[in-house]
From Swiss-Prot:
The lineage of its organism: Bacteria, Bacillati, Bacillota, Bacilli, Bacillales. It holds the Pfam family 2_5_RNA_ligase2. Keywords: Hydrolase. One of its GO terms (molecular function) is hydrolase activity, acting on ester bonds. HAMAP family: 2H_phosphoesterase_YjcG. A motif (HXTX 2) lies at residues 115-118. It comes from the Bacteria. The active site is at residues 34, 115. This is Putative phosphoesterase BPUM_1117. InterPro entries: 2H_phosphoesterase_YjcG-like, Cyclic_Pdiesterase, YjcG. Belongs to the 2H phosphoesterase superfamily. YjcG family. Its EC number is 3.1.-.-. A motif (HXTX 1) lies at residues 34-37.
């Protein structure tokens, strides 16, 4: 089964993201706005149990994460994804790094850029128009997220929460 690890931002930030996603993101119906901490990976049921135990330890030893967003950006020319750029901080970078260690071993395909996607799979012209409009929009958002989630993918392509991990909490 395919799994992934994400942070879900506040409803306020999700509403901002969704105001664009419903028009510009074909994955809008498959997963709420999120910040991907670990790209999707395959696990058996037995491996999933081990990973849950490991993630519980990671969470216990981590602190809540501050998300600061001050602008929209894009991964162009690599791809036409437009996102709200989350300013990197020690907590989020450390958690991302841990999520590629044992037992979740793997090598990220790209350098980790904390972000919340608002548009993807756009034509070059549409990407240019949407990004130009969003870069004119002021955004100054800060919030603290105290949990992350292990998700799994259903047969229809949508993602659902398998387990939630509270940052800095025993248990």
């Amino acid at each position: 089964m395919k799994y992934g690890v994400v942070l879900f931002p506040s409803k306020k930030l999700q509403d901002i993201a969704n105001s664009y996603r419903k028009r510009y993101d074909p994955n809008y119906a498959l997963i709420p706005p999120h910040l991907t901490l670990r790209t999707p990976f395959e696990l058996t049921d037995l491996e999933a149990a081990e990973v849950v135990s490991t993630l519980r330890e990671y969470a216990k030893n981590a602190s809540p994460i501050t998300l600061r967003i001050k602008k929209f950006s894009s991964f162009a020319p690599v791809n036409n994804v437009i996102y709200m750029k989350v300013e990197p901080n020690e907590e989020i970078m450390a958690l991302n790094e841990r999520l590629y260690a044992d037992p979740l071993e793997g090598t990220p395909e790209y350098a980790f850029v904390p972000h919340v996607t608002v548009a993807q799979k756009l034509s070059d012209d549409e990407h240019s128009d949407v990004l130009g409009t969003l870069k004119l929009r002021k955004i100054d958002h800060e919030e603290t997220v105290d949990r992350f989630h292990l998700l799994y993918q259903l047969e229809n392509g949508s993602w659902t929460v398998y387990e939630t991990f509270i940052l800095g909490e025993e248990g």
